[in-house]
Amino acid sequence: MSFTNLLEKYDFKLASASEEYKQRRKYQMALFMASGAATIFAARFAFKSTMARQYVPTLFQGNHQPPTSYNFTTDAAVAVGTGTVLCGSVSSMIIFGTCWMMDVSTFKEFGWRMKTVMGGYEKQKQLAQMPLDEESEIIQNGLNDILEGKYDDIE
């Protein structure tokens, strides 16, 4: 039994979707899964690097001072790099997950979707129906006159 037949059997809407739509959703899923794998890898790397830098004193050493061979600069660089990788991978996972959920594949689609979600078309219609103030009307009429070639007619 094929995947499409299984979807039709349980009456999923995806069964009647086009192949292009299915490919698009698979691509979005793959991006999310890849960023999830990168996040898991980065978290594991951060854990290992933290454990490797851990200082465990011997029996009669004090635990309030690091050994003299300890390099604070290297430790800071590793911490900043690890934090940056973790932040980037988690951010990419959030972004790709949101785009997969909203069915967005390009920046242009994201702009359209946000405009729709935030009521951009209705607000644009309301703005177009509002009356102009006197100064704006004078400027608009002047520009229309210039475009129509009436700039020589001085009244």
Swiss-Prot record:
One of its GO terms (cellular component) is mitochondrion. Belongs to the AIM11 family. The gene is AIM11. This is Altered inheritance of mitochondria protein 11. It is a multi-pass membrane protein. It comes from Meyerozyma guilliermondii (strain ATCC 6260 / CBS 566 / DSM 6381 / JCM 1539 / NBRC 10279 / NRRL Y-324). It is found in: Membrane. The keyword Transmembrane applies. InterPro entries: AIM11.
